[in-house]
């Protein structure tokens, strides 16, 4: 019988890792999934992703993207809704630590998941803030980025402007050449250090929704495949639908909820509660 990897076991975070996430707006966690676990999910994610990626060829695009694959594949559903990933997010945003003793644990909901594949020689991913897109009225929304293959620096792993989440919303600008230029100047002016490093398949980063981030070009002849999942605390309300992307996201990923509504549609399963 083929072994099933349901990601139900816990990944234990140190206080240092939790403090680093809150201070820097991102944290790197090694081997969140083991090599066997990554192999178990990679085949299904890759197969469903390639079936759903846009067919039109565009050599200038920074990545191939398709969302909510979990409704096409049980394995992707298992991955995105896994207790392990939900518990990590809960610990990062709510677990009491010595310097923050009054924080309480809380439920964590999924916003959406997506496959992001950067093709060989694919261009850089411009600097941007995810929460420009996410209509979530919280500063505790969290994005997971996990490579499904080993990603050396030449392949374009994710990179972060450390500490940039503390600015919150910066500007109404979507991911583009314009956002790359604007945020690069902003990063330079604020003198934010840039974090990036090579990652193994199954390693993961978690980042705050306001953390400025992007990725360099894929200079290799291999596809950089990664899985992204976005989570937020239960009790969050829908934020202002202040741009077309937020209108679209509320429609497709929050079940048509409107500004001020609780973000608790049937699409937004609670993946962890304590």
Predicted regions and their residues:
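Non-heme Fe(II)/2-oxoglutarate
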Residues: 6, 51-55, 61, 204-206, ...
């Amino acid at each position: 019988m083929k072994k099933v990897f349901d990601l139900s076991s816990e990944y234990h975070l140190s206080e240092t890792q939790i403090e680093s996430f809150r201070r820097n707006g991102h944290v790197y966690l090694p081997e969140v999934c083991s090599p066997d676990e990554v192999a178990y999910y990679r085949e299904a994610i890759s197969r469903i992703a390639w079936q759903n990626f846009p067919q039109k060829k565009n050599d200038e695009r920074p990545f191939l993207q398709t969302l909510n694959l979990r409704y096409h594949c049980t394995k992707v559903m298992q991955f995105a809704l896994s207790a392990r990933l939900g518990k990590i997010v809960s610990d990062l945003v709510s677990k009491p630590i010595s310097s923050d003793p009054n924080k309480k644990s809380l439920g964590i909901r999924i916003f959406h998941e997506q496959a992001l594949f950067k093709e060989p020689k694919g261009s850089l991913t411009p600097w941007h803030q995810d929460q420009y897109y996410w209509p979530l009225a919280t500063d505790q929304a969290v994005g997971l980025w996990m490579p499904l293959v080993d990603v050396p620096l030449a392949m374009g792993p994710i990179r972060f402007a450390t500490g940039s989440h503390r600015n919150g919303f910066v500007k109404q600008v979507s991911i583009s050449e314009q956002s790359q230029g604007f945020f690069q100047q902003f990063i330079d002016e604020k003198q934010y250090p840039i974090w990036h490093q090579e990652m193994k398949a199954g390693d993961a980063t978690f980042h705050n929704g306001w953390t400025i981030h992007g990725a360099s070009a894929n200079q290799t002849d291999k596809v950089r495949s990664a899985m992204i999942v976005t989570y937020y605390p239960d009790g969050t309300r829908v934020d202002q639908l202040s741009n077309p992307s937020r209108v679209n996201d509320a429609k497709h990923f929050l079940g048509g909820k409107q500004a001020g509504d609780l973000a608790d549609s049937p699409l937004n399963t609670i993946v962890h509660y304590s």
